[in-house]
Amino acid sequence: MLPAQKQTLEALLADSVQQVAHALKGADAANAGVAFVAPAITLERPKVAAHGDVACNVAMQLAKPLGTNPRQLAEKIVAALTAQPGAQGLVESAEIAGPGFINLRLSAAAKQAVIGAVLAQGRAFGTSDREKGKRVLLEFVSANPTGPLHVGHGRQAALGDALANVIASQGYAVHREFYYNDAGVQIGNLAISTQARARGLKPGDAGWPEAAYNGEYIADIARDYMNGETVAAKDGEPVKGAGDVDDLDAIRKFAVAYLRREQDMDLQAFGVKFDQYYLESSLYSEGRVEKTVDALIKAGMTYEQDGALWLRTTDEGDDKDRVMRKSDGTYTYFVPDVAYHVTKWERGFTKVINIQGSDHHGTIARVRAGLQGLHIGIPKGYPDYVLHKMVTVMRDGQEVKISKRAGSYVTVRDLIEWSGGAAPGQEAAPDLIDEATITRGRDAVRFFLISRKADTEFVFDIDLALKQNDENPVYYVQYAHARICSVLNEWKSRYNGELAQLPQADLSQLTSPQAASLMQKLAEYPDMLTHAANELAPHAVAFYLRDLAGEFHSFYNAERVLVDDEAPRNARAALLAATRQVLENGLAMLGVSAPEKM
């Protein structure tokens, strides 16, 4: 049911309920000044298709307040509903089920209306401007610039980019932000790792630093640094390798710039773009961390104990107070996070969403407590969080734990290339991997990583990603789109068909249960998008697309499209064209391509 139809039916049912309630309560209630307030009408699709198209339980909710039997009440509501002129073109029939469920069947014309809506609106179908004028900052990935992006970052990138698209579909202006943790212990470890490689050491050698990173990429950084190469991140200043093995600060700056560039390349391969990169180091250089700490001290939110500065996080629901500044004068890792979120608020983002790994769960209360303690108007519960669990990579039935690039973990680029069909070991020669392989891999990785709820662990099966059959969910959905393209191309060539003529097709020809079910699924797309945005649940789009592809395949297997009779042929072509458009729209939400041939 389309949103406009749903709103109309809800209004008709609400009016019917008021009529029945007034008749039951009579003038006594009115004379006593008792206003009857009906509950909000909730419409759902019945779990069993035979029960109709729409179900409502309002009679069971109101039976007790109105002092009547729920089934009898349902009969009165249905009688009032079907008597209304507005319902006669929308509702074909109504029946009472069980203790008082109202099951409605929509008219054929009401079901068919979705085809015209999709064909008229095209890529805009399903979107809304209900949140127009509102801004959202969505922070995701936010990796340390100490190595290539790993599969956990990949899950964040897929979830974040898809969620940004879904939220934007409701009218929000979405600002995508990447927070670079370019300050702290990890950056120091990166510098000494690169320095050790520049001196000719390798993992396992005497003198190799215990905290050093072992990936081969460190050797590449050291080589380019010693050779005087110049590197730059997309938003950064060029940094030239000094070639001085003793200048640790120069090594650090070069290594950070090198890895920021590499992460930019990872994100480009993944099809993810950001509006802004925010550097943690800038919070220190601009004095924002100190300013935030001073403000919390002045607000009475801190105390000294054992030589450390503590934040009263228990005031905001944390299980214990937390150290802000250690006895050696350094800050704990959540302190710059508080300062960073102050900048988000000061930049006018009253709605902020962070996508992070579930290992960050403990920082939520600390960051929120710090923000509340500043007393600058930030609401409780700011920011929102989407936490995701880990990803395990499997190939040939075995877990893959390391890669040639990173040494100790699987990178996003590994996953893209393997899922696109690159042979094991081919990542060592990336110039030999063509764009088609990257596209296939990117589509598979993005769809797979979005296809489960964020708070569930995910097993990424490389072998499944390579299958070209119904077991592979992204192939299943993309194949539905490609098959429709093929049928419509044949319809054009064989019958001189024009897509522009499809809105005039006689849709009354669509009489089969499979056609009705497919149209019903198409009509659910706008409400599904709204739900996905409200619940911060981009996986709902992946679930929907699999269901839509299934409905299409059921229809296609049950009915021939290219029949001799023009009227049913064009009606079925119109249904296919609408289905193709919604598949394309949904795949675009996930950042996945909609191929015309496979």
Swiss-Prot record:
Which enzyme type, at the first EC level? ligase
Q: Which GO terms describe its cellular component?
A: cytoplasm
Where is it located? Answer: Cytoplasm
Q: Name the predominant localization.
A: cytoplasm
Q: Which SUPFAM superfamilies match?
A: Anticodon-binding domain of a subclass of class I aminoacyl-tRNA synthetases, Arginyl-tRNA synthetase (ArgRS), N-terminal 'additional' domain, Nucleotidylyl transferase
Which InterPro entries does the record associate with it? aa-tRNA-synth_I_CS, Arg-tRNA-ligase, Arg-tRNA-synth_N, Arg-tRNA-synth_N_sf, ArgRS_core, DALR_anticod-bd, Rossmann-like_a/b/a_fold, tRNAsynth_Ia_anticodon-bd
Instruction: Motif 'HIGH' region: list the residue ranges.
Output: 143-153
Q: What reaction(s) does this enzyme catalyze?
A: tRNA(Arg) + L-arginine + ATP = L-arginyl-tRNA(Arg) + AMP + diphosphate
This enzyme's EC code(s):
6.1.1.19
Record GO biological process: arginyl-tRNA aminoacylation
What Gene Ontology molecular function terms does this protein carry? arginine-tRNA ligase activity; ATP binding
Q: How does it assemble?
A: Monomer.
This chain belongs to which protein, by name? Arginine--tRNA ligase
